[in-house]
Regions:
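A short beta-strand-loop structural module common to alpha/beta enzyme folds
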Residues: 34-45
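A structural signal for isolated positions on well-ordered beta-strands in alpha/beta enzyme cores
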Residues: 8, 36, 152, 191-193
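Secretory-pathway luminal glycosyltransferase catalytic domains
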Residues: 5, 46-187, 285
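A short acidic (Asp/Glu
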Residues: 20, 46-50, 164, 202-206, ...
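Donor-binding and catalytic core of enzymes assembling or modifying cell-surface/extracellular glycoconjugates
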Residues: 15, 185-278
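Extreme N-terminal starter segment of soluble prokaryotic enzymes
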Residues: 2-8
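A short, glycine/small-residue-rich beta-strand->loop->alpha-helix junction that serves as a flexible
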Residues: 11-20
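Short amphipathic alpha-helix
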Residues: 20-28
């Protein structure tokens, strides 16, 4: 029998995409509906998603990581039987929040008109990765970032190191150096923390250009643990984003006073404080 108040949301993608889907679910819960998540994508397409032919040094999975970063929030997973029953109520409408259950939400059209700034403000106090309980190295780095004048720099490479149909051209070296220069002009004694899925590239192309600046290239996480980069970035006083979405996700879960520097337009930026957009044009090869 169908639950007339149940909404099922099909989730896919990396940790920031998952955050979008999860936040959408929270908005439905505010309407008094029950929400479950279809995570079958991770069991199928997510296995080996990050591969050598996509620019990674080895094969990595994309996992369902929301429960790992919000362990104290209630999350329900849809059964395969429920998924099959609700698929006939599927929608990919941009106006999905106006739809009423029974409902099965698929795709990314929902994000066109979705503003999750407020809901992220509500859940960010619950953003405590389980790894903090079991890994002292992670805990200590987080405490160091909170203690220092920290600037987190996210450098997305891997599958986005070449021009991408959805993300466009990759942010180039000049963009990151310009942003770092701006930060250094604004604040003295800043410490840079680099988070990337290609540390070798960062060490060869960025670090040699910023001699004399205190910096750390984090090696705590792998591409399979992007949620840790999201956590560390959210703790930084300043976040420098790339053409990927990690920096924006970190800003959503950070404190209001955190400065976010980005090359990427997003309508939600107008609902936030302390935003700096840097216009840039990647150099042609």
């Amino acid at each position: 029998m169908l639950d007339p108040k149940l909404v099922i949301i099909k989730v896919d993608g990396g940790i920031v995409s998952q955050l979008y889907f999860f936040a959408a679910g929270k908005l439905f819960e505010k309407k008094g509906y029950r929400v479950k998540y279809d995570i079958t994508w991770f069991e199928q397409e997510g296995r080996g998603f990050y591969s050598v032919d996509k620019g990674y040094n080895q094969v990595y999975n994309v996992n369902w990581d929301i429960p790992k970063i919000f362990p104290n929030l209630h999350i329900e997973i849809a059964s395969k039987l429920e998924i099959n029953r609700y698929k006939k109520f599927a929608t990919d409408s941009e106006l999905f929040l106006e739809c009423k259950p029974p409902l099965y939400i698929v795709g990314y059209n929902y994000s066109v008109n979705l503003n999750i700034v407020e809901i992220c403000r509500e859940i960010r106090n619950f953003f405590t990765p389980l790894d903090l309980l079991t890994n002292d190295k992670i805990k200590f780095l987080g405490e160091e970032i909170k203690r220092n004048k920290s600037c987190g720099v996210h450098i997305r490479r891997g599958d986005l190191s070449k021009e991408h149909v959805a993300y466009g051209k990759p942010t180039d070296i000049d963009y990151f150096l310009r942003c770092i220069n701006i930060v250094m002009l604004m604040h003295k004694n800043i410490k840079l923390y680099f988070f990337s899925d290609d540390n070798k590239w960062v060490k060869e192309n960025i670090v040699p250009c910023i001699k004399g600046i205190d910096c750390v290239v984090s090696d705590i996480s792998t591409p399979e643990q992007g949620y840790l980069d999201l956590y560390f970035l959210s703790l930084c006083k300043i976040i420098i984003g790339s053409h990927g979405s990690m920096g924006f996700g970190a800003k959503l879960l950070s404190q209001e006073e955190t400065l976010f520097i980005t090359p990427k337009y997003n309508s939600m930026l107008f609902s936030m404080h302390n935003i700096m957009m840097i216009n840039f044009e990647p150099k042609s090869n």
